[in-house]
């Protein structure tokens, strides 16, 4: 008898399960199922044909791949979650009976979830874990600012606080920071760790405001925090050992004191004070700077290669960036956010301090004469020292992004600051702000100004070459004119002898005249004509080329090609909108300036 093929028993109909079916198969509640999927990295799938995958149902449901659910069935944590469900029921029963002794015993025996094997499973190599540090550090820095709540306990916040401080200390010791940026969301930092770029966000410190459950589900965030704390512990241990630092690090101040847990100001002060202290090394081996110097010496061998030359220039620029603030001492006023500035200054070799009467961890006083810069964010100061520069905080961020110490005249107290440009913009961006373009041009001009003598000598050589070229052109024109006049004169003088010559010499003279005429034609100067392109025809040709290019794309790549075209159109549209908006702003500013000038003139004439 032939086996009958039933509907939805093969193909997409048999490959997907709904969330309800998956929970029934795993015998877990909704909360435990979400927690398990977060820990294992399992996410819902989007099928190609939803109607077939949902077995004819028209409702939009959350679907999971059948292989993913089978993969979760073999996870040992599933048994722990089932045991927890039983323990929760028993603890609730003991609490209802009023038997506190039995309740405490069951709470002490509450099963714990171990995530070590999941970390090894999801990140087989250390580089894989580094690639996932972006979300990890962003979430840990966010949780470190939370107070103790019902869902987010004090243990989680203190652990996030400790791990984030350890990671910042590694960036300081290895000088791994590369880019910084300030926005309304917080402080953006980018570090280079083991050849991988890690970007994370540190939020601004504002008083905590409770959020509604519809907006933020702290239970889901807690599941991510549990996973990322274990992951960050492994990563920090490996990073500290790679640069010969003792782990766990010993800080001069306690990060888990009772006062810091109850008082937010004390917590922030102790956290920043920990950043301003050096860590203990496991041995006195050479630092990474010596290794970089050895690599630079090896690159000196092949100076003809353009790639090697570029690598050497990048290495030299990176070494300068690592020691950007070396030898400089900064005093931070109390109105300035200290943690991001202390972190940046310490990463690039600078020394920072603040008022020791207000915050702990200060290393020198404001009256120290060796202070080179004082960071101020107020319109004026009653007392100022001549031996130091008073700058606004943006100067620190712009210096790091430009990889050089910028002039302080644009960042003085009360000055209108230049635009704070993002260093994360790509070079192939369609729209480039005018300020960024001017800044790029200014960098080139400054580079030329630093090499003043070379630029002057190059200009002199160019002027000499131009003079020689002009003289050569003048000599050629003069020779052409002389040759032309000689040809005309010789033609007028040869008319008389031609009548007296015999008929035998006539062919030779004809050949000579033909050659002269050909020379004249070759030496003739013809005025050029400007070719005007028709924009409509040019647009038509480009459309035809695009259509031809689209026909040449293979059928399996046409969907990807359409997505690429849609993305390009979207980027072009956004760039055009930004350009129009910029033109409107510039026009408005020009009108305001003209109106201001008119009012000033009227006031002067009225006087």
From Swiss-Prot:
Keywords: Nucleus, Ribosome biogenesis, rRNA processing
Record GO terms (molecular function): ribonucleoprotein complex binding; RNA binding
Database matches in Gene3D superfamilies: BRCT domain
Region (Disordered): 486-607
Residue stretches making up the BRCT domain: 320-413
Ranges of compositional bias, category Acidic residues: 495-511
InterPro entries: BRCT_dom (IPR001357), BRCT_dom_sf (IPR036420), PES (IPR010613)
GO CC terms of this entry: nucleoplasm; PeBoW complex; preribosome, large subunit precursor
Role played: Required for maturation of ribosomal RNAs and formation of the large ribosomal subunit.
Family per record: Belongs to the pescadillo family.
Protein name: Pescadillo homolog
Lineage: Eukaryota, Metazoa, Ecdysozoa, Arthropoda, Hexapoda
């Amino acid at each position: 008898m032939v086996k009958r093929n039933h509907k939805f028993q093969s193909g997409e109909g048999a490959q997907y399960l709904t969330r309800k079916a998956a929970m029934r198969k795993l015998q877990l509640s909704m909360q435990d199922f979400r927690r398990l999927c977060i820990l294992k990295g399992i996410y819902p799938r989007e099928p190609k044909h939803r109607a077939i995958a949902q077995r004819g149902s028209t409702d939009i449901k959350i679907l999971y791949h059948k292989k993913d659910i089978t993969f979760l069935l073999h996870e040992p944590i599933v048994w722990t979650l089932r045991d927890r469900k039983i323990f929760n029921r028993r603890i609730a029963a003991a609490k209802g009976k009023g038997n506190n002794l039995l309740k405490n015993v069951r709470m002490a025996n509450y099963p714990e979830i171990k995530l070590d094997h999941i970390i090894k499973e999801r990140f087989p190599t250390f580089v894989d874990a580094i690639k996932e540090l972006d979300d990890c550090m962003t979430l840990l820095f966010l949780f470190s600012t939370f107070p103790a709540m019902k869902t987010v306990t004090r243990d989680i916040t203190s652990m996030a606080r400790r791990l984030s401080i350890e990671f910042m200390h590694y960036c300081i010791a290895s000088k791994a920071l590369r880019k910084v940026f300030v926005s309304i969301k917080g402080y953006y930092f980018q570090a280079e760790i083991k050849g991988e770029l890690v970007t994370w966000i540190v939020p601004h410190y504002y008083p905590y405001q409770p959020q509604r459950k519809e907006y933020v589900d702290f239970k889901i965030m807690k599941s991510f925090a549990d996973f990322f704390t274990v992951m960050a512990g492994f990563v920090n241990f490996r990073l500290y050992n790679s640069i010969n630092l003792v782990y766990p690090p010993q800080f001069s101040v306690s990060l888990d004191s009772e006062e810091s847990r109850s008082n937010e100001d004390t917590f922030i002060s102790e956290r920043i004070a920990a950043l301003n202290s050096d860590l203990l090394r496991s041995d006195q081996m050479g630092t990474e700077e010596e290794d970089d110097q050895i690599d630079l010496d090896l690159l000196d061998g092949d100076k003809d290669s353009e790639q090697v030359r570029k690598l050497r220039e990048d290495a030299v620029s990176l070494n300068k960036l690592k020691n950007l603030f070396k030898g400089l001492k900064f005093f931070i006023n109390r109105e300035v956010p200290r943690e991001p500035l202390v972190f940046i200054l310490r990463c690039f070799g600078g020394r920072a301090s603040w008022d020791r009467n207000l915050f702990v961890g200060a290393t020198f006083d404001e009256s120290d004469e060796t202070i080179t810069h004082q960071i101020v964010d107020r319109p004026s100061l009653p007392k100022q020292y001549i031996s130091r520069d008073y700058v606004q905080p943006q100067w620190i961020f712009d210096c790091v992004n430009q990889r050089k110490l910028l002039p302080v005249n644009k960042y003085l107290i009360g000055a209108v600051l230049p635009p704070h440009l993002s260093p994360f913009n790509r070079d192939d961006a369609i729209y480039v702000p005018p300020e960024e373009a001017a800044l790029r041009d200014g960098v080139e001009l400054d580079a030329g100004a630093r090499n003043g003598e070379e630029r002057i000598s190059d200009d002199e050589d160019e002027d000499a070459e131009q003079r020689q070229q002009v003289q050569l052109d003048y000599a050629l024109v003069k020779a052409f004119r002389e040759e032309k006049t000689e040809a005309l004169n010789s033609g007028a003088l040869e008319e008389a002898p031609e009548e007296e010559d015999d008929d035998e010499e006539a062919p030779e003279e004809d050949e000579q005249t033909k050659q002269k005429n050909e020379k004249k034609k070759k030496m003739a100067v013809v005025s050029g004509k400007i070719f005007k392109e028709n924009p409509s025809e040019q647009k038509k040709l480009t459309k035809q080329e695009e259509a031809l290019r689209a026909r040449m794309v293979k059928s399996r790549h046409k969907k990807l090609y359409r997505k690429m075209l849609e993305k390009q159109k979207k980027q072009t549209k956004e760039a055009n909108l930004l350009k129009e908006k910029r033109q409107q702003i510039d026009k408005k500013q020009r009108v305001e300036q003209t109106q201001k000038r008119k009012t000033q003139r009227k006031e002067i004439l009225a006087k």
